[in-house]
């Protein structure tokens, strides 16, 4: 039940499922199907960061996402843990990471994940087109 509650909280709050205000049933179904996949993925990352924080990030997140985030932060890809990856995604979404702040919320995680996802899409496009920066 707790996991199910967390899933719906992620779907509702983080993914803003209610705010989509789709009027046609088919559009709502398609939107919820996509958002549910994202919510499950984010919930898996959260559980990995909480339950097994020292687990290598490449085992719980796509390797490209870890590599892009590491490059963005100017750090080596090796040695990233699930918890470190989770908090860095949250920082992309505006999380400050101070001690009294507690854990990041779903909206912050969702914003950070969307930014990271856009960065990985950009890297993938640049690689397929043979583009280079600098």
Regions found by a protein language model. Give the residues of each.
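Short, conserved catalytic/metal-binding motifs centered on acidic residues
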Residues: 1-13, 37
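A short, flexible helix-boundary coil/loop motif
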Residues: 13, 18-23, 33, 38-134
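Short runs of predominantly hydrophobic/aromatic residues within well-ordered alpha helices
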Residues: 4-7, 28-34, 82
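Short, surface-exposed loop/turn motifs that are enriched in glycine and acidic residues
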Residues: 1, 21-27
């Amino acid at each position: 039940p707790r996991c199910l509650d967390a899933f719906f909280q992620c779907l509702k709050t983080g993914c803003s499922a209610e705010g989509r205000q789709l009027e046609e049933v088919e559009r709502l179904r398609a939107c919820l199907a996509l958002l549910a996949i994202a919510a499950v993925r984010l919930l898996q990352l959260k559980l990995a960061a909480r339950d097994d924080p020292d687990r290598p990030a490449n085992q719980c997140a796509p390797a490209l996402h870890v590599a892009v985030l590491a490059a963005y932060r100017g750090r080596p890809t090796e040695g990233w843990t699930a918890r470190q990856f989770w908090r860095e995604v949250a920082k992309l979404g505006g999380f400050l990471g101070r001690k009294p702040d507690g854990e990041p919320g779903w909206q912050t995680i969702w914003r950070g994940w969307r930014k990271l996802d856009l960065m990985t899409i950009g890297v993938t496009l640049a690689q397929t087109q043979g583009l280079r920066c600098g």
